[in-house]
Amino acid sequence: MAARSAIAHRWSVLPAEAGSPVGETGFYAGLDHPGTAARMTLYADAAPELALCAVASLREQIRIDDATHLVVASCTGFVAPGIDQIIARRLGLSPSIERVLIGFMGCYAAVAALRTARHIVRSEPDARVLVVTVELSTLHLQAVDEIEPLLAMLQFGDGAAAAMVSAEPRGLAIGQSFATTLAESDKLIRWDITDTGFAMHLSGEVPARIATALADRDLVKIIAAGQDPRAIDAWAVHAGGRSILDAVEHALMLDAATLDDSRAVLAANGNMSSATLMFVLARILARPRVEHGVALAFGPGLAAEGFAFGPAA
């Protein structure tokens, strides 16, 4: 199963010096897996650390100390004071910074975070919105032997990303957003809180349902802003899995190389939930000028969300 996933590497915050997470000294050692409380304790420590690493990389490219707003997305843990407050405090940001925490939305939460940042900047042109996505999926390994949950767990790894959204003419400009929820699809992707962490249910029907949805010309017209999908310069598709990327490629009749950025992120990192789309956008940001791009992600609902993007200047 792992060989067919198109994933070469996945990463975890679980300490390497402890050996294999499922070994005798690992986090999952023993017959009984850790309870949810133990997993949340680790999340409270490790999630801010990983988020700060992402912000440090961003800081090498752009100033962040004058951020007026902070938007954080995460679905792999809970802590109060919230991870948004922890990040703001650890970064030394103003105590008056306005914060938004987008929780438990799953893989398309980066769309919601960036969309929220865009709305803030449109209403307050001087705003500088720091956006952070951080996910620790490897804290939620489940002691199961059924094929479907095993396949789901094979997809996910840990990751974090950060971006600054402002009216400054730099980078990519976020355009019109879109969202849709598929009918009778609420059981296809689930993220349930249990006594032993969060349990992922990812139905094998998801790729086919996505392909069926993308066969709707009216929906594709909205997603592609009225253009032929093949005329879009850059498709930033959430790297949710090999079969999901294949479904999007075939349904939209895209060239084989169109989703190379998404496939590269999948191969190097696996599915990092909300952080994944940010990694894909970072690769596109490094390209020469992109005139017409579309970001597209899927998650619980089953829902699809995204936005158009283009040059900021």
Where are these regions (language model features)?
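Condensing-enzyme catalytic core mediating Claisen C-C bond formation in acyl metabolism
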Residues: M1-L42, R128, A143-T212, D216, ...
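Conserved beta-ketoacyl condensing-enzyme motif
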Residues: R4-L93, P229-L245
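Glycine/charged-rich beta-loop-alpha catalytic/anionic-binding loops adjacent to active sites
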Residues: P34-G35, D65-H69, L91-G103, A143-E148, ...
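Claisen-condensing/thiolase-fold acyl-transfer catalytic domains that form or cleave C-C bonds
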Residues: C75-T76, S96, L101-R122, A211, ...
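Active-site-adjacent elements of ketosynthase-type condensing enzymes
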Residues: V79-Q85, V131-L151, F178-D195, R242-H250, ...
